[in-house]
């Protein structure tokens, strides 16, 4: 479970996707681009935060 994940609007999500695509177009791997964007979002986000739980689907 992850606590304190930023709660993003659709527009904010779209901008994040576009930023990830830009980073990948510049040669960054998808994993690095996603990690960088997540770090930027956590550092700059001032809105609500959610708690998310991810479960392994194979169980």
UniProtKB/Swiss-Prot annotation:
InterPro entries: UPF0181 (IPR005371). It holds the Pfam family UPF0181. Belongs to the UPF0181 family. NCBIfam families: PRK05114.1 (NF003476). This is UPF0181 protein YoaH. It comes from Escherichia coli (strain SMS-3-5 / SECEC). The gene is yoaH.
